[in-house]
């Protein structure tokens, strides 16, 4: 019986082959879901998905696109937003 904290499905079950030839069950936290646009819900490109300790190892320029609203709005929604701002 696994420890209580591993019985939840928030942990992914991974079978590892050890050097001794045994298959051992390991528990791994699942990857977070992909980032989506705040307006239309479309998947965002250029935004890595991973656990915080993996993302923290990346350079700032690799964490999200270097444009206004990068990592928050998709490119088409950002374009619409800029047009509306200019028209006001």
Curated annotation (Swiss-Prot):
GO terms for biological process: translation. Disulfide bonds: none annotated. GO terms for molecular function: structural constituent of ribosome. One of its GO terms (cellular component) is ribosome. It comes from the Archaea. Signal peptide: none annotated. Keywords: Ribonucleoprotein, Ribosomal protein. Belongs to the eukaryotic ribosomal protein eL34 family. NCBIfam families: PRK04059.1 (NF003143). PANTHER family: 60S RIBOSOMAL PROTEIN L34. This is Large ribosomal subunit protein eL34. It comes from Methanobrevibacter smithii (strain ATCC 35061 / DSM 861 / OCM 144 / PS). The gene is rpl34e.
